[in-house]
């Protein structure tokens, strides 16, 4: 707020306010030589206002935990789970009869497992999976204050599930030549509950070609996209420095 007060009157922002803060915490515990746990948390809040009638706010929240397990001298596993949240809101009250609040938020939940398997002194296999569930509030427009005549409008919420499995091979063939190859198989599914339009066969999507409205129940897989992703790279050292 102090910085805003230093601005010239003609800037139009002299009566504005701004502020932010962040909180973070990490807890790590080693149970023994084979098992350890890390827990992480983060929260941030930002606010800004050009004046008392126009305000903006943002919030971020992250929380996760990771378990490290050494199964043997050649196999190590990392198991993680977490939650991410972001929200935004804008309040406009210059005109009491048209005052509104606009808000949006997204939530993500994930689990993943990563493994490192040392096949030989210079040959390592990496594999695992990750799955993430998305909950998205695409937008809410609503009246701000009892005098507002704004009509509330809420966009449909979106839910989706994204999952991927991967396998990678790192091999140092010689001190000069190494190869890294891998494959990742990804799946993305749109989930209910949600209503969507059905269009006339062979016609472009348009209001005039809508033939029906389909309602998918909670948790129903409406559409799934999937496919492999390949990766191949090589490194060759011509000299010790190049």
What are these regions (language model features)?
Residues 9-13, 48-54, 62-66, 94-103, ...:
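Extracellular loop and loop/strand-boundary signature of outer-membrane beta-barrel proteins
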């Amino acid at each position: 707020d102090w910085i805003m007060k230093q601005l010239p009157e003609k800037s139009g922002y002299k009566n504005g306010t701004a502020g932010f803060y962040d909180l973070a915490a990490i807890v790590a515990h080693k149970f023994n030589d084979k098992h350890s746990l890390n827990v992480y948390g983060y929260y941030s809040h930002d606010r800004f206002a050009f004046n008392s009638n126009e305000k903006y706010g943002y919030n971020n929240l992250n929380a996760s935990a990771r378990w490290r397990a050494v199964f043997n001298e050649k196999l190590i596993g990392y198991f993680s789970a977490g939650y991410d949240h972001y929200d935004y809101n804008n309040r406009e009250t210059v005109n009491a009869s048209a005052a509104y609040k606009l808000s949006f938020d997204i939530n993500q939940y994930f689990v993943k497992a990563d493994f490192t398997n040392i096949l030989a002194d210079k040959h390592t296999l990496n594999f695992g999976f990750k799955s993430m569930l998305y909950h998205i509030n695409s937008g809410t427009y609503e009246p701000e204050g009892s005098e507002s005549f704004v009509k509330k409008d809420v966009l449909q919420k979106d839910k989706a599930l994204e999952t991927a499995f991967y396998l990678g091979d790192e091999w140092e063939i010689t001190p000069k030549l190494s190869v890294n190859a891998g494959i990742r198989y990804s799946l993305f599914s749109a989930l209910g509950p949600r209503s969507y339009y059905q269009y006339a066969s062979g016609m472009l999507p348009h209001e005039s070609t809508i033939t029906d409205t389909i309602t998918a129940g909670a948790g129903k897989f409406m559409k799934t996209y999937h496919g492999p992703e390949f990766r191949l790279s090589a490194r060759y050292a011509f000299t010790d420095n190049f």
